[in-house]
Amino acid sequence: MTATTDLSRTWPRRAAVLSLHTSPLEQPGTGDAGGMNVYIAKTSAKLAELGTEVEIFTRATSSDIPPVAQLAPGVTVRSLLAGPFEGLDKNDLPSQICAFAAGALRVEARHDPGYYDVVHSHYWLSGQVGWLARQRWGVPLVHTAHTLAKVKNAALAEGDTPEPMVRVMGEEQVVAGADRLVANTEFEAADLIERYDADPEAVATIPPGVDLERFTPGDRSAARAEFGLPADAVVLGFVGRIQPLKAPDVLLKATAALLDRHPGLRERLVVLVVGGPSGSGLERPRALHELARSLGITDVVRFLPPQRGDALASVYRACDVVAVPSYSESFGLVALEAQACGTPVVAAAVGGLPVAVADGVSGLLVDGHETRRWADALASVVLSPGRRARLAAGTTGHAAGFSWESTTEALLDTYARARTTFDARLRIREVTA
């Protein structure tokens, strides 16, 4: 199931990348933009550097967005009209699959036959479009799910909304129809095989990477000064979309418990919550503020909007610990970015986080989401400078094992394997026709 690069391959001249529900041009950390946006942007740019031109198809969400934009040299983003710009909830997007597919097919029709060599779809909505494009364009389909409905529904946060059956059925169709499936970790690969009956030979395990040039250790005092934080503060951080799935409430509840046990810590403690509302979190965008107020910790909690680029790296550097308490996470790029900056991570032992975080080496993994356990884990790091230093020493070495270059090389290998599968399926169909 693990992709290798020893297979001789023909690199595709041009790849069509489908991302219906969110654009790589959007700011991660708010709305539906997150790790998937980073993944698409980084791998597309690296594919172009390696000689494969990339066209990314996404849905237009504003009249201010140009229909065609350049993300990086050799990478074009096409924003297609499919439904209204505003007021369309993510749960309503299945109604726009046909409109989006029609837009993509019209773009391809303006080119000579065989213009695209491979289709790579991201998330199940795009997978449905990729399923159709595969048939119409006669090219292999590679699909990356990023999240899976059956996995999310098996680990719902309290008060969160289950993924609908239409998504489950859509994912099952894409899994069956794709020539190659990309899983972020062996855990996700197992979910595809066991929960979705994927062919084990069709699943490639390719971990995401991290930008090791941007996310590096730096001056903590300088980073804290950027956000007006005292140099001697004890800083806990959360970075991500504000929604039940990402569980920032777990961090706030653990913070309250930590202060109950160690009231003297209040004078120095700062909890940074960096991100914007998303998904079911949009239903009550102020819910986390209300929780902080009810817990009596508004004096230590600071809310910041999503941060870009170097500012995001400064957030990680400013923290003593970054918490990733998600209920479900196919990988966890935030955890990897924080470690690349030299900051230990305390994360939930779910999904791909046991791969993203080396337990006891670069951070700690916590079983479950019980407040007491999280307070214990956080206390064991922030109240023990020696332990924090030992974990910090293991962060950059662990993060160095993940690069976008290696991710993209493995994707190219997977594209070649997908072509082999596609050709074999085509021959079988011709023989049985």
Curated annotation (Swiss-Prot):
Homodimer. Catalyzes the transfer of a N-acetyl-glucosamine moiety to 1D-myo-inositol 3-phosphate to produce 1D-myo-inositol 2-acetamido-2-deoxy-glucopyranoside 3-phosphate in the mycothiol biosynthesis pathway. GO terms for biological process: mycothiol biosynthetic process. NCBIfam families: mycothiol_MshA. Belongs to the glycosyltransferase group 1 family. MshA subfamily. Transmembrane segments: none annotated. GO terms for molecular function: acetylglucosaminyltransferase activity; D-inositol-3-phosphate glycosyltransferase activity; magnesium ion binding. Keywords: Glycosyltransferase, Magnesium, Metal-binding, Transferase. 1D-myo-inositol 3-phosphate binds at residues 21, 32-37, 90, 123, 147, 167. Pfam families: Glyco_trans_4_4 (PF13579), Glycos_transf_1 (PF00534). This is D-inositol 3-phosphate glycosyltransferase. Mg(2+) binds at residues 316-317, 319, 343. It catalyses: 1D-myo-inositol 3-phosphate + UDP-N-acetyl-alpha-D-glucosamine = 1D-myo-inositol 2-acetamido-2-deoxy-alpha-D-glucopyranoside 3-phosphate + UDP + H(+). UDP-N-acetyl-alpha-D-glucosamine binds at residues 27-28, 35, 241, 246, 307, 329, 337. Coiled coil: none annotated. InterPro entries: Glyco_trans_1, Glyco_trans_4-like_N, Glycosyltransferase_grp1, Mycothiol_biosynthesis_MshA. HAMAP family: MshA (MF_01695). Its EC number is 2.4.1.250.
